Each structure stands twice: as C-alpha cells, then as structure tokens.
Amino acid sequence: MVFISGQTAWDERKNIIGRDSVLEQARQAFSNLEKAMESTGGTLKDIVALRIYVVDYQAECGTAVGAVLRETFSLENPPASTWIGVSALADPEFLIEIEATAVLD
C-alpha cells in the first residue's frame, strides 16, 4: 500500500498555481498526485481512496473539483472519495489538499 498526503497547488518551485481558483488548484494538486504516484512506480489507476479537503466548501467548489476528478480518473472504476470542508489549510492561499491511498500490484 502507498499513502500520499499533502498534495496541493504548489508547482515544482513552490509557487501556488490558481491562487483564487479551486478549479486550477485542483488541477495542479491532481497533477502533483500523479507525479507522486509515478515516483512510487504506480499510476493514478492504483489509487483506491481519496480524501479531498476544500476550504470554505460551497456548491461551486464541488462542481469544480468534480470536473477535475472526471478529467483525471476513469468513470468506470473511480477511487472512493471523501470530500471534507475545512476552515483553512497549511498555507492561507491553499484552497484544496488531497490525500490518497493506493494499492500497487
């Protein structure tokens, strides 16, 4: 099993991508998650569960995050996901953070 946490909207230089956009931050966070999975020898297909933390969760946040989930994962067998609204994350500019659990063959 692989456990990955702390996937946020940072790029490789620690710049925050999409400062005011849940959609853009979600895209960056899922891109970072994909890179983290590749570093373990796995892929996004190996992920079985997600925990998605969203600051000040509103319906439009769900629409944005849902769109990125559909872009990122197969609709046939997506990972189980739990979405959690929070008041803040480690950096005041983070709007989303992702944790994942994966099972590698």
What are the roles of these predicted feature ranges?
Residues M1-D105:
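Short, polar/acidic, helix-capping and beta-turn segments at strand->helix junctions
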